[in-house]
């Protein structure tokens, strides 16, 4: 399978690092002093985060100002101003804590009391000893199969302090663990698209923005909100993705926006808005395909020379095998978009060079394998795949997809000590046993169960006794919170490294205080796809309380297992940073970029002392890059990674799986819950989009929440006609509920959402009214309390967060106080 993602090059070059044990407070008086570096107590420090390069102003050893390193955008990114909030948050975990019942008897820890028990502060040494003792106990009784450390989440940026990979490295060196397959973002598409296009597509470089701006006549944005999602990147944001959307706005091109919500991007671009019912994108695409075929506006030559299986798909499209032609009129009844609009859209994308930029929300739905497969088929019919400015792209909304890649050095990163996956870093399968990430609840609730997955059988562990989670917040980001809570209370031991008292930390047994990325040194590339710079992530302030770097925690644990030297390889943290930088420096020297391109890259000591990023330039080749252009030029010499080497509209591989919920070609499946179903369990379709004021659940405890909250809760968008019918006014406190749970939210009444649809952004911290009560009210408005926890299909087993119906009503009771942002230890 081919994978061109620039992120892979970044993440798969390095090795791990370590630092002297129990020396956090002495870091800058020892290691840095020996190198001649001092902590800046008054002045400016350059660093980076998911939301971009930062310039921090330090006074008397404290952060007093946070701002962008460079101001290149008209669009403001408020995340860049929140560093002080993050470091000095009231809910910082400053010390190690152990849940009282667990500390009293780890063999009978009363897991049902998680979230209600008292916390006991312990010493760091005692916490390390307790974790090591209980992990050894689990390993002795259950082996690697008893330890779950999949631990998915948006951990901090940085190539040294990668908490998840540090955890995996430690676990691999001490006996193995149970991990996960896939992720929450693209759980369906990352498994279906290799069958269709031969590669992940979702984490691949896109046709470059300069090519799009020069050649595309029409840009269709389908189910995405890049003005919001491009505020962040997996590494350090380069801001250039947003800059290109500013350029798109000024270009005068026809822009069409397809989404049930007229979101920030649609409004910013002043685009034509088409609003289908949620989860009906495939029906709409099929209607467009029927119109193209019926009007003979399709590229027969492209389908014959670059694709396989259109002839097997066609009978379904024409209704010859189910007596249901997929006409625009048929699609109208399902999608709510008029047949006239569907026909016009089909002709528009065929008659004009069109780039369809798709988001990922449509595949986080029941049968989520189908939308991007159908989209690839639609674009194959237009014959524009591989042409300048034509076809489709699945990553323009993410981490700067389409920003030309720079030519320069690439710093290495931490490894798990296992065989590399050759894919995106967080998709690396480092564990001995793995199951699909979205099936965590199912695996805990049904030990030993065997499931289908992408043509294979996977059996869940017979007993998960020990969970270790870092860099994530699963209580918030997993679907059907109440079901997840039942599963979460089954293991004997749960350990969490965390910066704040998140819902996940509150539901653990042992909590280790972790530093923010502003309290430690690190290094990172800038731009997931562009690799436009190397930024020194210099420590800005001393750690708060007894918080420790994640690598320190795992190095200390490794010492308890006798593998410290193997874990750290005898290097300190700064030495690992230096070695990664030196690797990139050698690459630059070998390409003679200092002389040829004027790259200002110096030996490490000067780089670190100078306190500024090293910048690289994009190339003419990257600026003219066309996704699948080589394949288009010669499909024989440049085949795709599919069995046929061609675009597989019909997959014989999938056909042999004999799945009833994912067949051999794209098709419309009725979701388990949607607006068109009979006997609806609730009235409205709930979409849980990316939040404007957070990175998933990160930043929910900052001042930004206070500015954007409504009725001091997560906002829920409701159409003005629906609100009037329900007696709801803008700013009202409302209850959103279904059979799975109930939440409080603040009503945002607007015309910018389709009737019958509610929008409640994911990521609000779960705040139960009564944690001892089943299906209790979430006071803060966590969307996953309402979502469904079943797989997309047997093929991908992705999550279906966007498939859910819910009711809404004005809340008549007294508004309860939020407690989730308060420290659980009154003595702290």
Q: How should each PLM-predicted stretch be described?
A:
Residues 103-126, 297-337, 540-636, 641, ...:
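N-terminal leader/propeptide and maturation segments of large enzyme subunits in energy/redox metabolism
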Residues 162-247, 251-253, 257-258, 282-286, ...:
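Extended redox/cofactor-interaction regions of prokaryotic respiratory oxidoreductases
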Residues 179-180, 298-301, 342-343, 355-356, ...:
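Acidic/polar loop patches that form or flank catalytic/metal-binding clefts of enzymes
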Residues 270-275, 532-543:
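Short beta-alpha connecting loops at secondary-structure transitions
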Residues 288, 309, 313-439:
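Active-site phosphate/pyrophosphate-binding segments
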Residues 544, 549-602, 697, 702-717, ...:
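Long, contiguous, secondary-structure-rich segments that constitute the structural scaffold
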């Amino acid at each position: 399978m081919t994978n061109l993602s620039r992120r892979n090059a970044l993440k798969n070059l390095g090795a791990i690092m370590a630092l002297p044990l129990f020396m956090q407070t002495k870091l800058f008086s020892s290691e840095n002093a020996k190198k001649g570096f001092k902590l800046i107590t008054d002045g400016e420090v350059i660093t980076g985060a998911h939301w971009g390069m930062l310039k921090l102003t330090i006074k008397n050893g404290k952060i007093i100002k946070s701002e962008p390193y460079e101001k290149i955008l008209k669009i403001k990114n408020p995340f860049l101003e929140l560093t002080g909030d993050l470091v000095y948050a009231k809910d910082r975990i400053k010390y190690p804590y152990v849940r009282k019942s667990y500390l009293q008897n780890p063999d009978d820890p009363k897991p049902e009391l998680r979230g209600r028990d008292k916390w006991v502060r312990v010493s760091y040494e005692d916490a390390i000893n307790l974790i090591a003792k209980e992990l050894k106990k689990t390993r002795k009784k259950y082996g690697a199969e008893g330890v779950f450390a999949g631990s998915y989440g948006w951990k901090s940026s940085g190539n040294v302090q990668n908490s998840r990979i540090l955890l995996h490295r430690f676990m691999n060196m001490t006996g193995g663990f149970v991990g996960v397959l896939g992720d929450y973002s693209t759980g369906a598409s990352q498994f279906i698209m290799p069958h269709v296009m031969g590669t992940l597509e979702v984490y691949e470089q896109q046709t470059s923005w300069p090519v799009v701006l020069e050649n595309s006549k029409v840009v269709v944005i389908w189910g995405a909100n890049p003005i919001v999602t491009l505020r962040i990147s997996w590494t350090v944001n380069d801001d250039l993705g947003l800059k290109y959307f500013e350029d798109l706005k000024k270009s005068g091109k026809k822009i069409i926006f397809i989404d049930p919500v007229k979101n920030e991007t649609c409004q910013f671009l002043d685009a034509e808005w088409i609003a289908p019912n949620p989860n009906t994108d495939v029906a709409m695409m099929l209607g467009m395909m029927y119109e193209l075929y019926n009007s003979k506006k399709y590229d027969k030559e492209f389908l014959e020379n670059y694709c396989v299986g259109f002839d097997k798909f066609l009978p379904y499209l024409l209704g010859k095998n189910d007596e249901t032609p997929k006409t625009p009129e048929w699609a109208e009844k399902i999608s709510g978009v008029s047949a006239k609009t569907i026909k016009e859209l089909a002709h528009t994308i065929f008659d004009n060079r069109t780039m369809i930029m798709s988001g990922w929300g449509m595949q986080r739905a029941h049968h989520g394998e189908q939308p991007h497969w159908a989209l690839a088929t639609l674009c194959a019919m237009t014959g524009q795949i591989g042409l300048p400015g034509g076809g489709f792209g699945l990553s323009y909304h993410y981490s700067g997809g389409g920003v030309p890649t720079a030519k320069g050095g690439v710093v290495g990163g931490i490894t798990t000590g296992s065989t590399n996956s050759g894919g995106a870093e967080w998709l690396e399968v480092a564990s001995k046993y793995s199951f699909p990430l979205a099936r965590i609840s199912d695996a805990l609730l049904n030990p030993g169960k065997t499931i289908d997955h992408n043509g294979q059988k996977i059996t869940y562990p017979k007993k998960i006794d020990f969970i270790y989670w870092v860099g994530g917040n699963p209580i918030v980001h997993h679907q059907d919170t109440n079901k997840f809570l039942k599963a979460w209370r089954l293991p004997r031991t749960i350990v969490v490294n965390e910066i704040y008292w998140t819902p996940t930390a509150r539901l653990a047994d042992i909590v280790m205080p972790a530093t923010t990325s502003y309290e430690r040194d690190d290094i990172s590339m800038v731009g997931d796809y562009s690799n436009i710079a190397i930024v020194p992530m210099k420590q800005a302030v001393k750690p708060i309380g007894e918080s420790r770097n994640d690598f320190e925690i795992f190095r200390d644990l490794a010492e308890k297992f006798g593998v410290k030297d193997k874990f750290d390889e005898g290097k300190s943290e700064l030495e690992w940073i230096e070695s990664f930088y030196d690797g990139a420096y050698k690459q630059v020297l070998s390409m003679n970029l200092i002389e040829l391109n004027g790259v200002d890259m110096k030996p490490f000591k000067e780089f670190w002392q100078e306190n500024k990023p090293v910048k690289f330039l994009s190339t003419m080749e990257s600026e003219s890059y066309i996704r699948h252009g080589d394949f288009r030029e010669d499909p024989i010499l440049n085949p795709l990674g599919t069995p046929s080497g061609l675009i597989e509209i019909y997959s014989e591989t999938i056909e042999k799986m004999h799945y009833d919920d994912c067949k051999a070609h794209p098709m419309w499946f009725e979701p388990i819950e949607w607006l068109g179903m009979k006997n609806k369990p609730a009235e409205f379709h709930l979409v849980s989009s990316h939040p404007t004021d957070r990175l998933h659940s990160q930043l929910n405890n900052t001042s930004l929440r206070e500015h954007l909250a409504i009725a001091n809760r997560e906002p829920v968008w409701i159409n003005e006609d629906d609100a009037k019918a329900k007696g709801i006014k803008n700013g009202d406190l409302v209850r959103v509920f279904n059979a799975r749970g109930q939440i409080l939210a603040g009503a945002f009444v607007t015309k910018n959402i389709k009737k019958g649809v509610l929008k409640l952004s994911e990521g609000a911290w779960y705040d139960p009214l009564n944690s001892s009560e089943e299906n209790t009210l979430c006071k803060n408005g966590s969307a996953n309390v309402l979502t469904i926890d079943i797989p997309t299909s047997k093929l991908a087993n992705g999550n279906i967060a966007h498939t859910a119906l819910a009711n809404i009503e004005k809340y008549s009771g007294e508004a309860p106080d939020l407690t989730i942002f308060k420290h659980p230890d009154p003595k702290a």
